[in-house]
């Protein structure tokens, strides 16, 4: 029964794009024990994957802005102890950044990652015991799947399963069909204009499609409220 540690800390889209690789691992290595290191704000997403035994949260984003605090170094020391508390057969860093490679370096196990030409930050490859070439032009989902397959020794099959267990109920009444508008981003410069969301929502509403706008933080709630003034929009509760 192989023990596998996945290192993919952020951001939300990258974390979701890594889920099919984890499903592949579970399918090809039945009984494998899979743990996943992820940024604390995305831990709940990883916990939805049916094949992940343990979610190990980190706070790299918070730590970077507080390196002068003793509490930061205390948390880093606790993370290292946790990662070294049990051995892994494979440590797979599918992020390809120096920060993720350093996290993998803390763990006990054979460290796998992208080679210098494939990694997003070439220097990260120095921290791996085994380096794998994966074409950079592929979609992130396919790159993650190919890396895992190369590290664990199986062939990638067509198609992919995200393996996420979704809740069967929503906090509001939903009619079918519906569209889910994910309006939030990690940075303001990545936001799509609110007027564009309203325009798209109006076009979908004209076709009988209900638009749902989930939100988390207060500023996201306000943004969704402004967008939802267009016909056919509904705001769901916080996520």
Question: Residue spans of the language-model regions?
Answer:
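Catalytic machinery of carbohydrate-active enzymes
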Residues: 1-239
